[in-house]
């Protein structure tokens, strides 16, 4: 049996993230996993933070903003295709989509996403327009 894996981006989302974004699961290995996250045009995510998972996101479609806060450091950055950001464990974050197309990013979780209870809701920068999912 091969240890190599290959997968095409699913047409439909697999689940809804705790922040309310659609999630298309990609691949998972022992020390990390990758997924595609998408917010519909004009949507604002639920603000959240993670107990144990660091993330790196690379935006591939749309435009919007990402808010991050960790301790006394806080910032809002514009995001669009080509922008890459980190979300260290414990960071409060929220994102929103502008324009006429979805805002989408490829995200890497380290360690792999453990499932329910990893994400927890926090006070955000904006009023969310989506509902939290199970993750």
Describe each model-derived feature in a short phrase:
Residues 36, 66-68, 105, 115:
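Short hydrophobic/aromatic-rich beta-strand segments that constitute the beta-sheet cores
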